[in-house]
Amino acid sequence: INPGAILLRAAWMYDFPGDRLPIRGNLPLNLLSAAKTGTALHFSEHDFRGVSYVREVIDKLIPAMELPGGVYNFGSGNDCDMFETVSRFARLLGVEVPLEKDHWERNLAMSGEKLKDFGIQFDSTIQAFQQCLDDYGFGHF
């Protein structure tokens, strides 16, 4: 094992299609699709994870290459469960999505405190999504 190796633990990421690059399903696109089709989405109030704007992740990759060897959580933190997160994303998008509560448990929450010690800090999940909307000219719906 190389003690100088840097391992970045990434969160679920999203972006909107652009620059002729393929975008696979991600949270905002899943919400827009569900709003269009009326398909219910299922999320749990016992599921905790960050969801990161891929452009913010990319912007922080170069500084991350200067980190000392170790394992780092690399993405947005989140102070809400996924049901609340999805509800907030839908409100920011200005869409109504049929959401159903599931009850399974998962905790993939990440703390960025270790990164902060080295001057790298991510926006919260909700702040980053608002930035994404601003970057694409959607602003506040």
Feature roles, as predicted:
Residues R49-S52, C80, M110, I120-D123:
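Residue-level signal for the nucleotide or nucleotide-sugar donor/cofactor binding architecture
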Residues L31, K114-L115:
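Structural element of the ATP-grasp superfamily
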Residues P22, N26, S52, E105-R106, ...:
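Residues at secondary-structure transition points
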Residues I6-L8, Y72, D123:
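Hydrophobic/aromatic beta-strand patches that form the interior of the parallel beta-sheet core
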Residues I58-R106, S111-G112, F141:
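Mid/C-terminal beta-alpha module of Rossmann-like enzyme folds, strongest
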